[in-house]
UniProtKB/Swiss-Prot annotation:
Summary of the function given for this chain in its UniProt record: Probable phosphatase which regulates axon termination in ALM and PLM neurons, and synaptic branch extension and/or stabilization in PLM neurons. Plays a role in synapse formation in GABAergic DD motor neurons probably by dephosphorylating pmk-3 thereby negatively regulating a MAP kinase pathway that includes dlk-1, mkk-4 and pmk-3.
Protein name: Protein phosphatase ppm-1.A
Subcellular location: Synapse
Highest taxon, organism lineage: Eukaryota
InterPro entries in UniProt: PP2C, PP2C_BS, PPM-type-like_dom_sf, PPM-type_phosphatase-like_dom
Gene from which the chain derives: ppm-1.A
Enzyme Commission number: 3.1.3.16
Length: 468
């Protein structure tokens, strides 16, 4: 039995004591798993080399904790679990926003670090893709969700578009469009599809030589919007969703357990364990992750992790298409495509500023339990829902009343004789209870679940009051 070069994560406990969901009955099974893997040949087959036990390289630790091991060429190496998908004590809810318009569309973007110890997302939002023809009439939007570092995601946001436009297929397509007044035909659409795939592969190959990439990887979803078509490239588990009046379209995630992905992974000498590649990586296609792409016998699109995207081409329907969302999996972890589309439609009836629509989505996902970085771009087309002025005014009046109740409650709390600003904390639950007691939970308004919590957090931060 063989193991690919891609690292395999194994959880093990320092002692058979309770660590969250890890208990005495489960710890022996984990140790047995580690023992079994230690007897395997790392590279090659038994005929290539004799199977020898893998040496264990421990990391010193004096405390009871969840411990993580990786199978490497040096043996079972214990690594610092704090740097692997670790979370903050409190989420960082500050947001980065951009917005713009052009070519008959509007867009807004919001990103938030959330519970993660660092921000690894990046994005592109260009209402005008380029100043040259035909791209001056096209738009380009993309989101890159990094893992094990932000390096490849940041590089993708600054260089991927250039790789697409400079591909041989895009140049040939450009020449053809100049000759036929920019009309996308079947042949030019095929060139677009090939150009996107080659551009992704080219970017990934060139990035391999960069010194700052380290072991980071990222998913990618990009959307080109032309006057007549959507052309979407997807790599990994970020997603694009196009919402119309009567239908919703969404890209398909690349997960190791899907049949077509599993076949490639197993063909490259890997396996799918706990729905991950070799028990470690949760996506089957990505930029970077070069330790999963080191078999010299295989082309890039047949490695354990492939950098080749799926490309979707859809004709636009100007009367039906309302908006498109391009977002990372921090959104889709807690919302289905349909739930997200319905939520965005609802918020568009209240907000004319698309940044506020995106902010509401991120805050709602946080309340629903998303623990990941979150980045979202919403692109509105001519048929998008318009603001309902009566709904907008009613919600604004309700928000004003809630703010008044929260501030009055905090005034009373801070004025208490035993309250010490530097030591005592106000709980969000106590604020929510106060709002409920005042009969302010909305019944006739479709206000998002997160609204009271978000308002309370903002007021507490503005007043510099500690809270939990």
């Amino acid at each position: 039995m063989t193991i690919s070069r891609a690292d395999l994560q194994i959880a093990s406990s320092a002692e058979p004591k309770t660590h969250g969901n890890l208990n005495e009955s489960f710890a022996p099974e984990i140790r047995q798993t580690a023992s079994t893997i230690a007897s395997l040949s790392i590279f090659g087959t038994p005929s290539d080399q004799e199977c020898q036990p893998i040496p264990v390289v421990p990391r010193s630790s004096s405390s009871d904790e969840l411990r993580v091991w990786r199978v490497t060429s040096a043996g079972l190496v214990e690594v610092d679990a704090k740097t692997m998908g670790a979370f903050l004590d409190k989420p960082k809810t500050d947001k980065t926003n951009v917005h713009g318009e052009g070519n008959g569309i509007r867009y807004g973007m919001s990103s938030m670090q959330g519970w993660r110890i660092c921000m690894e997302d990046s994005h592109i939002a260009e209402a005008i893709m380029s100043q040259s023809s035909p791209y001056k009439d096209w738009s380009f939007f993309a989101v890159f969700d990094g893992h094990a570092g932000h390096h490849i995601a940041n590089r993708a946001s600054s260089q991927l578009l250039e790789h697409l436009i400079s591909s041989e297929e895009f140049r040939e397509m450009t020449k053809t469009l100049e000759e036929n007044n920019g009309v996308l035909t079947d042949s030019t659409l095929k060139l677009l599809e090939k150009g996107i795939k080659k551009g992704f592969l080219s970017f990934d190959e060139i990035s391999k030589t960069s010194n700052d990439i380290s072991k980071s990887g990222c998913t990618a979803v990009c959307a080109i919007v032309t006057p007549t078509h959507f052309i979407i490239g997807n790599l990994g588990d970020s997603r694009a969703v196009v919402a119309g009046k009567n239908e919703i379209f969404g890209t398909e995630d690349h997960k190791p357990y899907l049949e077509k992905e599993r076949k490639r992974i197993e063909g490259a000498g890997g396996s799918v364990m706990i729905q991950r590649i070799n028990g470690s990586l949760a996506v089957s296609r990505a930029f970077g992750d070069y330790e999963y792409k080191d078999d010299p016998r295989l082309p890039a699109d047949q490695q354990l992790v492939s950098p080749e995207p799926d490309v979707y081409i859809r004709e636009r329907n100007l009367e039906n298409d309302q908006f498109m969302v391009v977002a990372c999996d921090g959104i889709y972890d807690v919302m289905t495509n349909e739930e997200l589309a319905e939520f965005v439609k609802d918020r568009l009836s209240v907000h004319s500023d698309l940044r506020e629509v995106c902010d509401d989505v991120l805050d709602e996902c946080l309340v629903k339990g998303s623990r990941d970085n979150m980045t979202m771009v919403v692109v509105c087309f001519p048929a998008a829902p318009e603001v309902n002025i009566h709904r907008k005014e009613a919600e604004e009046a309700w928000v004003s009343r809630v703010k008044t109740v929260i501030n009055q409650f905090l005034d009373e709390a801070v004025a208490a004789e035993d309250f010490k600003q530097e030591e005592d904390m106000v709980t969000l639950k106590s604020i929510l209870d106060k709002v409920t007691a005042n009969g302010l939970l909305p019944t006739d308004l479709r206000v998002p679940e997160h609204t009271v919590t978000t308002l309370a957090q903002k007021i507490l931060t503005q007043r510099d009051i500690k809270h939990v």
